[in-house]
């Protein structure tokens, strides 16, 4: 539990640090100065935006790197969760930064183009644009992003008998994932954590089992984990959660639009008031600063730290709603995993309970977090809740229908 509690503290510390960095890069004049430099470098708006975003995000990540290092490397080694060397960790950190910069540049091009075209409705148009962008990322992630960090091989090469059982169980669920897209991931090269997941959508969907899971769980326990992951596809959780989240983000974008404009207006008013209060010598310096560094509207590249401050705050405040939706779907997937394993695993309840116990022990999970932490941070039900449900949900023993397996919608 000590590890989980440290992560809770680090989560809130990371939010505070990010906000502090954005505010510093805004109020110190760094963002405005960088905007002036990229304008002098190129007259092309696309080049200006690309350079500004790349340099700005590299500066942000550099300032965040001590916390990244402590959280992602020191803490996990201290508690015996990581097997990753420092060179590998730094390489992953750099690759993550590179991906972040590339994606951010593409988003910035869309964002600032829409702001320029429609200063009053850019929030709505950017929300529309975010839908195909997010869908495209979901589809290409298994092919482009995941292989940058881990190696994958078909599960049937190392676990043919388990693959046969998985295929039988997936067929029982009516889920068509070819054997060629059921993978084993070499997680043990970096971590001792036990996990499995599904990724992709449509023709890119695939099931991935970590090699640490295969090492720590037996065949029946692994099937319950796989059944849970299969439930996300059969129960259409990906499109459902996507739709719910997009509705929330529509509201967040509008709130963000109002907040960004208000902050910029207040900032300009504050600068003008400051100019009027100082003596002539200081006033001339402030005027020089204001002419070059004042942020007039959101179309200004130097508004990026303000945009990020607002985005961070509104997403943080929306976390309980977003995570509540996720917990609901994760509970459904737990239920589906038990139902689909019935008839394939001799005692699905015992296997499921054991799998949760082992994962909680290996991953150093907090089995029963405080109500506030659960409400604000947890995307899954707590371990205690999941074990309690796994031990008691057995409709087949009571002659009741299998709700989710028979009615996946």
Label every PLM stretch briefly.
Residues 1-268, 294-298, 312, 316, ...:
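Polar-ligand-bearing catalytic/cofactor-coordination segments
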Residues 298-306:
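Multi-pass membrane glycosyltransferase architecture that uses lipid-linked
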Residues 265-296:
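Intrinsic disorder/low-complexity segments
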């Amino acid at each position: 539990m000590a590890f989980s509690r440290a992560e809770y503290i680090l989560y809130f510390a990371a939010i505070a640090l990010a906000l502090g960095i954005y505010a510093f890069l805004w109020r110190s004049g760094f963002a405005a100065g960088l905007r002036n430099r990229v304008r002098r470098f190129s007259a092309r708006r696309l080049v200006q935006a690309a350079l500004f975003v790349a340099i700005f995000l590299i500066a942000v990540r550099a300032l965040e790197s001590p916390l990244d290092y402590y959280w992602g490397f020191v803490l996990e080694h201290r508690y015996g969760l990581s097997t990753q060397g420092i060179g590998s960790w730094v390489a992953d950190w750099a690759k993550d930064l590179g991906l972040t910069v590339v994606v951010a540049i593409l988003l910035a091009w869309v964002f600032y183009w829409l702001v320029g075209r429609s200063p009053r409705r850019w929030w709505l148009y950017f929300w529309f644009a975010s839908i195909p962008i997010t869908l495209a990322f979901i589809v290409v992630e298994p092919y482009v992003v995941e292989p940058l960090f881990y190696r994958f091989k078909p599960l049937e090469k190392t676990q043919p008998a388990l693959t046969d059982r998985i295929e039988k169980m997936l067929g029982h669920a009516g889920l068509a994932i070819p054997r060629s897209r059921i993978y084993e991931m070499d997680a043990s090269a970096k971590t001792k954590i036990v996990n499995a997941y599904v990724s992709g959508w449509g023709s890119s969907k695939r099931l991935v089992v970590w090699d640490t899971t295969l090492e720590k769980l037996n065949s029946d326990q692994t099937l319950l984990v796989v059944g849970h992951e299969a439930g996300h596809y059969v129960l259409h959780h990906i499109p459902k959660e996507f739709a719910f989240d997009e509705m929330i983000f529509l509201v967040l974008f509008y709130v963000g639009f109002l907040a960004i404009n208000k902050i910029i207006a207040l900032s300009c008013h504050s600068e003008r008031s400051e100019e009027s209060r100082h003596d002539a010598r200081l006033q001339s310096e402030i005027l020089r600063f204001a002419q070059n560094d004042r942020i007039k509207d959101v179309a200004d590249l130097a508004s990026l730290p303000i945009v990020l401050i607002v985005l961070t705050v509104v997403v943080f405040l929306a976390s309980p709603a977003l995570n509540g939706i996720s917990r609901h779907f994760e509970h459904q997937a737990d239920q589906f995993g038990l139902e689909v394993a019935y008839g394939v695993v001799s005692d699905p309840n015992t296997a499921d309970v054991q799998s949760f116990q082992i994962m909680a022990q290996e991953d150093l999970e907090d089995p029963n977090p405080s109500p506030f932490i659960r409400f604000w941070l947890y995307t899954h039900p707590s371990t205690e809740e999941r074990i309690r449900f796994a031990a008691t949900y057995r409709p087949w023993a009571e002659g009741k229908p299998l709700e989710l397996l028979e009615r996946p919608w």
